[in-house]
Design a protein with these regions (language model features):
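N-terminal loops that bind phosphate or other acidic moieties
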Residues: 1-366
């Protein structure tokens, strides 16, 4: 059954993204280089896993879709996390509308089309060369496979290949990626999740490709090869807006105007997102006046789980961390070095402060 596939494969794919969170974080240069894309995607997926695992055995795909929608909305962190939540919602709702016990190629294509519809609706100003581009490209590939009367297995395999090829094209679409010599972090995170999910379905749980996540200034594309050192441009002038502000919102009125309030958020900053359905929403915006944003929304309902962080400071910390790693790599050879496996950026920072020479991103599967 489709429900069993999602229930069994989703946690495995989420764990792979968690294991690669630090690697994804290092690629994070857009929209601001605050180094948290992998962490935010992992936290969002992790909340969904908890919701799915809380369901009774034999839960339907409709039940699982509701759990994915609710879990991803409640747990969404950061710009990447909120967009990921909408991708998951759209695809899950699409799968829930499938009629048969097994997903057909048409079901897969339809679910991805719905994912594109929901995710792009949530973002006022979609940017090419990001996670949304990869989503659209794999959806287009699924449509092509449906027209070619491909089997579901052939379609899934083709989607994985297209996901990484789309990631490899991101530096050609978004100049800041080319300038920094990397692919888009969110795009790579989504491709990783897709491959990990398909591999779990194919009986290869926890396996993903080695993907070269760097590009050179002459235009050589990223490719499936071996992950090499990431050369990050440390010079960043800063964003016009300093504070990443996000919170959950419960509207007081059934007439809450989503469009008008999204327009207000846009007037206060950028990367504005207002997702969900009345009365419960997730709100995200980069702004210089989080106080005004919160006050505005308090007049329209209740707010909770407020999270405000200074992106300038995060970018500085990320730059310093990269600089320290470079200095350690280029320094004189030591008679004895320490290598540690860290399950996440928080542990990596602690180990680095203790003098560990090399940090390897990993988790429970290592």
């Amino acid at each position: 059954m489709i429900a069993n596939v999602v229930r069994n494969c989703f946690p495995v794919a989420a764990q792979v993204v968690a294991d690669k969170a630090d690697e994804i974080n290092k690629l994070n240069v857009f929209p601001v280089p605050d180094g948290d894309t992998g962490t935010n995607m992992s936290l969002t997926l992790g909340t969904v896993v908890k919701e799915i695992e809380a369901l009774p055995q034999g839960a339907s795909m409709d039940d699982i879709a509701k759990a994915i929608t609710h879990g991803s909305l409640m747990g969404a962190r950061g710009n990447s996390g909120v967009i990921t939540s909408q991708i998951l919602r759209g695809v899950a709702e699409g799968l829930a509308s499938s009629k048969g016990a097994q997903a057909t190629t048409a079901d897969i294509a339809s679910a991805l089309r719905n994912g594109v519809k929901v995710a792009f609706k949530a973002v006022r100003k979609p940017v090419e060369g990001t996670i949304l581009t990869v989503l659209r490209d794999v959806s287009t590939k699924a449509d092509q496979m449906e027209r070619a009367k491909a089997t579901p297995q052939e379609t899934l395999d083709a989607i994985v290949v297209e996901a990484y090829e789309s990631v490899a094209r991101t530096p050609d679409l978004l100049p800041v990626l080319r300038e920094n010599g990397v692919v888009d972090s969110g795009a790579f995170g989504l491709a990783t999740f897709i491959e990990a999910f398909v591999n779990a379905y194919n009986g290869k749980a926890g396996e993903v490709s080695d993907f070269r996540t760097t590009v050179d200034s002459e235009g050589a594309k990223a490719q499936v090869a071996g992950v090499v050192d990431i050369e990050i441009n440390e010079d960043w002038e800063g964003s016009e807006f300093r504070y990443c502000t996000e919170f959950l919102f419960h509207a007081d009125s059934p007439d809450f105007d989503e469009s008008a309030n999204l327009k207000y958020l846009s007037s206060m900053g950028d990367c504005e997102l207002l997702v969900g359905s009345n009365p419960d929403y997730k709100i995200h915006v980069h702004t210089n006046r989080p106080d005004r944003v919160l006050r505005h929304m308090l007049h329209r309902g209740q707010i909770f789980n407020v999270f405000v962080h200074n992106m300038d400071l995060e970018a500085q910390e990320r730059t310093e961390s990269i600089r320290e790693d470079k200095q350690a790599a280029s320094g004189p050879r030591k008679p004895l070095g320490f290598v540690a496996v860290a399950a996440g950026s928080g542990q990596a920072d602690i180990l680095r402060s203790l003098g560990v020479d090399v940090i390897v991103s990993g988790g429970q599967t290592m």
